[in-house]
């Protein structure tokens, strides 16, 4: 494997008491495969059922029950690998990972160790400051999820729910290419976006569909990697950032005090803002991996992989590039719009819907600033928007025609958002049309000039005062005066 060697970024260094430190981060993201049935049984993967309601004899590890691979889960893993620009291994092997845990009924987990279904790939991560960084994908393998232990139903007993047991997971392992909490959060956000575009994982972290094991180490700039600690099962992007910052500080304090870091598995406690030791970090030999004798090697036909590849949707990076090229959007605006598949589709229906080709920049500005801003206030997303793309398109058409001004458009949008209706009908019914009658605008301007001779003297000495006259005229016209006509008349009347 060729390692991506990333130069030290001084902006990402952490200041310690004895100098600067660089944090090195790698992530193992566990993504639940979007499928109706589990990896090796026909039991349902539906979330939220009564305990032990979706459990087959295979999931419960009853004697004599043999696993049978779910082809759709394999297809979803291959689609994900293709979406990550990764190598697809036509032959892969399922292994038994041996360890004991109460919610693991087999006494081992079926996973993939030496021969995963997907090899090396890459994710391009866009950071808030406009920088883009490549993050290497080391591998993607399929494995079973475990069940769930429940400890809060009784003070003296623990219970096991096997509904989740046997559900297919994709473990997506990144290289240690990340250098800050912000980069790690951006990486998981981008990875989740790709999975959602592909339809291979819902990415709902609240339901446990996506969770991460976070590997953190620190070193002096330019030195070899330090000893890493793994923070298990972090279940939100915000907590991933907090866990990294907390663990990096803990390690720096130990090293600056002359201590050493023990390689171990830790848990993040968001309430206390600390990581706690869980157990010493296992090595691969501790799990006694060996090929599962109940499962033949998984052999994929090249033409089947090509068929899956031909059916892939347009992914975020390609869509972003197209939005920039076709609609003239800035990289930032295009990035905001493609962050979710639904928002990208909504924008395209506004900019290019109903057979009308609209100004892309104007459409993006209105969708991002007006629609998204209003939805955020209501705690909604675009899928539950009360305003349709057709309605926003109609508002933009009214602006382009000169029927309404940009200011009136905001008022009109608020009416449509709260009350609904056809924008054109609302404009007519409420008298919101822009005043384009030059005579009417001139009359308003004459009245303001006549009433404010002192301001006239000031604007002749200080032309920037023109804005005051514009404001007064707009107020007098109820915000309906055509802004360009108003400016032209004012300048002519005032002689500036």
UniProtKB/Swiss-Prot annotation:
Record's catalysed reaction(s): L-glutamyl-tRNA(Gln) + L-glutamine + ATP + H2O = L-glutaminyl-tRNA(Gln) + L-glutamate + ADP + phosphate + H(+); L-aspartyl-tRNA(Asn) + L-glutamine + ATP + H2O = L-asparaginyl-tRNA(Asn) + L-glutamate + ADP + phosphate + 2 H(+)
Q: Which major enzyme category is it?
A: ligase
Keyword set, alphabetical order: ATP-binding, Ligase, Nucleotide-binding, Protein biosynthesis
In the Enzyme Commission scheme, what number(s) does this protein have? 6.3.5.-
Domain of life assignment:
Bacteria
Q: How does it assemble?
A: Heterotrimer of A, B and C subunits.
Q: Which protein is depicted? A: Aspartyl/glutamyl-tRNA(Asn/Gln) amidotransferase subunit B
Gene symbol here is gatB
């Amino acid at each position: 494997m060729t390692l991506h060697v990333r130069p030290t970024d001084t902006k990402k260094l952490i200041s310690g008491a004895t100098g600067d430190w660089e944090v090195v981060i790698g992530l193992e993201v566990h993504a639940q495969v979007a499928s109706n049935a589990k990896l090796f049984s026909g039991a349902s993967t539906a979330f939220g059922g009564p305990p032990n309601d979706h459990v087959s004899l295979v999931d419960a590890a009853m004697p004599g029950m043999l696993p049978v691979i779910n082809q759709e889960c394999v297809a979803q893993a291959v689609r994900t690998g293709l979406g990550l620009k990764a190598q697809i291994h036509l032959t892969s092997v399922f292994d038994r990972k041996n360890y004991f845990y109460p919610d693991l009924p087999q006494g081992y987990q079926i996973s993939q160790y030496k021969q995963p279904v997907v090899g090396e790939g890459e994710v391009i991560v866009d950071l808030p400051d406009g920088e883009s960084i490549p993050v290497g994908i080391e591998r993607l393998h399929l494995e079973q999820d475990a069940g769930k232990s429940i400890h809060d139903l009784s003070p003296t007993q623990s219970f096991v729910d096997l509904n989740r047991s046997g559900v297919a997971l994709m473990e997506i392992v990144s290289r240690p290419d990340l250098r800050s909490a912000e980069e790690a959060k951006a990486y998981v956000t981008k990875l989740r976006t790709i999975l959602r575009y592909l339809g291979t994982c819902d990415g709902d972290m609240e339901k446990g569909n996506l969770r991460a094991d976070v590997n953190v180490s620190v070193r002096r700039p330019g030195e070899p990697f330090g000893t890493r600690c793994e923070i298990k099962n972090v279940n939100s992007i915000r907590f991933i950032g907090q866990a990294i910052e907390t663990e990096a500080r803990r390690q720096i304090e130990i090293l600056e005090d002359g201590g050493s870091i023990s390689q171990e598995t830790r848990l993040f406690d968001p309430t206390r803002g600390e990581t706690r030791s869980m157990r010493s970090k296992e090595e691969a030999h501790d799990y006694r991996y060996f090929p599962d004798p109940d499962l033949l090697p998984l052999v994929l036909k090249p033409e089947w992989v090509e068929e899956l590849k031909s059916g892939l949707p347009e992914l975020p990076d390609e869509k972003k590039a197209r939005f920039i090229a076709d609609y003239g959007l800035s990289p930032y605006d295009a990035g905001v719009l493609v962050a979710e598949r639904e928002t990208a589709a909504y924008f395209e229906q506004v900019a290019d819907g109903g057979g009308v080709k609209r100004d892309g920049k104007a459409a993006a500005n209105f969708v991002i600033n007006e629609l998204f801003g209003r939805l955020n206030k209501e705690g909604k997303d675009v899928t539950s928007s009360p305003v349709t793309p057709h309605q926003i398109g109609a508002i933009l058409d009214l602006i382009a025609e000169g029927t309404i001004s940009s200011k009136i458009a905001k008022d009109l949008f608020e009416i449509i958002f709260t009350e609904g209706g056809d924008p054109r009908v609302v404009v007519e019914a409420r008298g919101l049309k822009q005043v384009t009658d030059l005579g009417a605008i001139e009359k308003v301007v004459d009245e303001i000039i006549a009433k404010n001779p002192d301001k006239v003297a000031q604007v002749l000495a200080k032309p920037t005062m023109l804005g005051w006259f514009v404001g007064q005229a707009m107020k007098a016209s109820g915000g309906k005066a055509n802004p360009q006509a108003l400016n032209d008349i004012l300048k002519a009347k005032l002689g500036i």
